Swiss-Prot record:
Pfam family, one: Fer4_NifH
Organism: Methylorubrum populi (strain ATCC BAA-705 / NCIMB 13946 / BJ001)
Protein name: Light-independent protochlorophyllide reductase iron-sulfur ATP-binding protein
Keyword Signal carried by entry: no
Annotated residues for binding of ATP: G41, I42, G43, K44, S45, T46, K70, N211, R212, P235, D236, L237
Alphabetical list of HAMAP family matching this protein: ChlL_BchL (MF_00355)
Cofactor annotation remark: Binds 1 [4Fe-4S] cluster per dimer.
Top-rank taxon, per record: Bacteria
Family note: Belongs to the NifH/BchL/ChlL family.
The protein's annotated pathway: Porphyrin-containing compound metabolism; bacteriochlorophyll biosynthesis (light-independent)
Record keywords, A-Z: 4Fe-4S, ATP-binding, Bacteriochlorophyll biosynthesis, Chlorophyll biosynthesis, Iron, Iron-sulfur, Magnesium, Metal-binding, Nucleotide-binding, Oxidoreductase, Photosynthesis
GO biological process, one term: photosynthesis, dark reaction
Catalytic reactions on record: chlorophyllide a + oxidized 2[4Fe-4S]-[ferredoxin] + 2 ADP + 2 phosphate = protochlorophyllide a + reduced 2[4Fe-4S]-[ferredoxin] + 2 ATP + 2 H2O
Length: 297
């Protein structure tokens, strides 16, 4: 019996960062890919889902991939908690060839395709591995060939090698933040992770999305200092809270002038990103420097 042995994937070390090179066969080459990061609870899933709808309203074929073990990224699109990739794989003892696309892909509002990667039980395994397996599974079933836009909605502000794995696939990383100390502090750490990964991967920072904030003065001041730009601003509105409780995207809510301003902003954001947002060559601050920089006495 002949046993085929694949050459190991090379490991690169850059400035103390141990990084596994992406197998060329796993690259997403047929779509524009965005990875959405931000502090935990900042509204990344809300932002990702409404951005996905905005892309779909531009006539684009959209796939949203939730990268959180809670698997709650896409429920406003699908109106339910979708089955996870890891659960689907476990059901067939990890024989992926036995799965059908409908076992792990759910079509949501306005035709947005939704996938929840899921993750290992708490305290075990690596979530980044699950993200990698999700992309491989999508490729095996040729589900990326008819896709124009992929949106990765990534867990919290975790920037370990595992949950930084969507950066291997992304063209642009987007950071969702609020106009407060904790959100901007988390954003700086994410900038540092992306700055490190961009040495080996093609990902670049696309910009910042201000969320749940009446003002953006601290965000804008930080952006100017490190080399970022604000792409959109979504204030803290009750209609957003109600849309989550209704398990709906903002585009499905009862029309109002306030809501129209928000959905118009999402449409403008989608148009900007589709046209090709120039990369931000941001350089993160050191933690202590940022501590002194933010806020006022």
């Amino acid at each position: 019996m002949n046993i085929a042995i694949r050459n190991p994937v090379p490991i690169r070390r850059e400035e103390g960062s141990l990084q596994v090179a992406l197998d060329p066969a796993d690259r997403i080459e047929t779509a524009k890919v965005f990875a959405v990061y931000g502090k935990g609870g900042i509204g990344k899933s809300t932002t990702s889902s409404n951005l996905s709808v905005a892309f779909s309203k531009l006539g684009k074929r959209v796939l949203q991939i939730g990268c959180d073990p809670k698997h709650d990224s896409t429920f406003t699109l699908t109106k339910r908690l979708a089955p996870t990739v890891i659960d689907a794989l476990e059901s067939v003892n990890f024989h992926s060839e036995e799965l059908r696309p409908e076992d792990f892909v759910v079509e949501g509002f306005n035709g947005v395709k939704c996938v929840e990667a899921g993750g290992p039980p708490a305290g075990t395994g690596c979530g980044g591995y699950v993200v990698g397996q999700t992309v491989k599974l999508l490729k095996e079933h040729h589900l990326l060939e008819d896709t124009d836009v992929v949106v990765f909605d990534v867990l919290g502000d975790v920037v370990c090698g595992g949950f930084a794995s969507p950066l291997q696939h992304a063209d642009r990383a987007l950071i969702v933040t609020a106009n407060d100390f904790d959100s901007i502090f988390a954003m700086n750490r994410i900038v540092a992770a992306i700055h490190s990964k961009s040495k080996n991967y093609g990902v670049r920072l696309g910009g910042v999305i201000a969320n749940r904030s009446a003002k953006t003065d601290e965000i804008d001041r930080f952006n100017a200092a490190v080399g970022l730009r604000r792409l959109a601003h979504f204030p803290d509105l009750d209609v957003v809270r109600r849309s989550r409780l209704k398990k709906s995207t903002l585009f499905e809510m009862e029309p109002s002038p306030e809501l129209k301003a928000v959905t118009d902003e999402y449409m403008q954001l989608a148009e900007t990103l589709w046209a090709g947002a120039d990369p931000c060559e941001a350089v993160p601050m050191k933690d202590r420097d940022l501590f002194e920089f933010l806020g006022f006495d």
